[in-house]
């Protein structure tokens, strides 16, 4: 591991009011974009076979140019509410983990409330934690329910293809990676404990290894404004890959120690799959059979905070995850953050 930081010990979850997952959803644009589509559009020196060999992706979804992420998010939210037979005005809180959102302010989660027709002035806000954002939201949601909320809606993902590269310059290290998708999850109150452990961390060692430059650091007189400010920058992809694999081992072991479980007690093992090979490397590191997990990177690409929830939904939709099963759910973001939870589905 590159980092020399000390990772904190786990703290046992001390909850008096329990949460459970009522429903979940995935919403993707209709437009399918293949590797060949990208190669032809940008006249790149690459082949579909080479792209699949290097990162394991076949296709991804792109949103229409006039689409906003709040359009996708509101649909994902509606699906969650319908599946749980919960009305929008019953929500106590909405939190969205974004990459960009519709705009910088106000929060995109507020726009979702507007599109859902919510008539109550409930809290709604956005956070940013890259690919690990959804585990942060899950941790927050179970604590909000512990302190009095009845229904917490959490949302993740974005129209991240627009940050793969600009029209002026195409970066072949990132242009094939990104895909557009969002996810939703509705949590409610339970009489029994479902969430058994939670562990989150950040590691500033990796701050400069995956980033989007735009910010006050770039908006000064010594820097020329450029579209490159909005590009996803990844100076060393192998460092990010290894940080994810290392994070997987660290977080999984912290969670298992917290619950006194072993991997044999885990029915479903979910983690973020920034590439197909990163997912496989994590399973190999933990000696987890592929049948216990899922990766949809080959189909949707890097959907940032939606990565792990999409894999979870795949296990649900295919019947491999059933109520009562034990899930180890993790996500690792941009090298600089990560975490996970163990819960009974």
Regions found by a protein language model. Give the residues of each.
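Buried hydrophobic positions in well-ordered alpha/beta secondary-structure cores of metabolic enzymes
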Residues: 21-23, 51, 80, 91-94, ...
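Phosphate/pyrophosphate-binding loops at sites that engage ATP/ADP/AMP, CoA/4′-phosphopantetheine
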Residues: 76-92, 250-267, 315-320
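Acidic-glycine-rich active-site phosphate/pyrophosphate-binding loop
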Residues: 44-52, 103-117, 154-164, 217, ...
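Glycine/charged-rich beta-loop-alpha catalytic/anionic-binding loops adjacent to active sites
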Residues: 57-58, 90-95, 114-128, 164-170, ...
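Claisen-condensing/thiolase-fold acyl-transfer catalytic domains that form or cleave C-C bonds
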Residues: 2-7, 70, 74, 100-101, ...
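Flexible, glycine-rich active-site loops centered on histidine and acidic residues
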Residues: 146, 150-181
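A glycine- and small-aliphatic-rich helix-loop capping segment at beta-alpha/alpha-beta transitions
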Residues: 37-40, 108-119, 142-146, 167-175, ...
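Condensing-enzyme catalytic core mediating Claisen C-C bond formation in acyl metabolism
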Residues: 2-65, 168-242, 250, 345
């Amino acid at each position: 591991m590159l980092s020399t930081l000390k990772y904190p010990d786990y703290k046992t979850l001390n909850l008096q009011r329990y949460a459970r997952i009522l429903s979940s959803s995935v919403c993707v644009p209709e437009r399918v974009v293949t590797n060949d589509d990208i190669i032809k559009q940008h006249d790149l020196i690459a082949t579909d076979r080479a792209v699949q060999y290097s990162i394991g992706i076949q296709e991804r979804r792109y949103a229409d140019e006039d689409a906003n992420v709040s359009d996708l998010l509101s649909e994902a939210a509606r699906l969650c509410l319908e599946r749980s037979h919960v009305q929008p005005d019953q929500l106590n809180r909405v939190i969205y983990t974004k990459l960009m959102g519709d705009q910088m302010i106000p929060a995109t989660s507020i726009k979702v409330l507007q599109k859902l027709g919510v008539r109550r002035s409930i809290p709604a806000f956005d956070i940013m934690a890259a690919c690990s954002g959804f585990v942060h939201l899950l941790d927050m949601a179970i604590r909000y329910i512990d302190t009095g909320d009845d229904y917490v809606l959490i949302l993740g993902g974005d129209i991240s293809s627009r940050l793969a590269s600009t029209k002026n310059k195409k970066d072949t290290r990132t242009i094939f990676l990104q895909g557009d998708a969002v996810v939703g999850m509705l949590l409610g109150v339970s009489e029994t404990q479902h969430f058994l452990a939670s562990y989150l961390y950040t590691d500033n060692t990796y701050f400069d290894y995956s980033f989007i430059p735009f910010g006050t650091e770039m908006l000064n007189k010594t820097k020329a404004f450029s579209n490159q400010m909005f590009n996803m920058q990844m100076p060393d992809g192998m460092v990010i890959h290894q940080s994810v694999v290392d994070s997987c081992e660290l977080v999984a072991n912290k969670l298992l120690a917290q619950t006194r479980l072993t991997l044999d007690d885990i029915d479903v093992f979910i983690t973020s799959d920034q590439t197909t090979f990163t997912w496989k490397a994590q399973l190999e590191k933990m000696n987890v059979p592929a049948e216990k997990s899922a990766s949809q990177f080959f189909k949707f690409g890097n959907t940032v905070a939606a990565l792990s929830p999409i894999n979870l939904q795949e296990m649900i939709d295919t019947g491999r995850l059933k109520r009562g099963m034990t899930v180890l759910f993790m996500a690792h973001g941009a090298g600089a953050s990560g975490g996970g939870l163990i819960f009974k589905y």
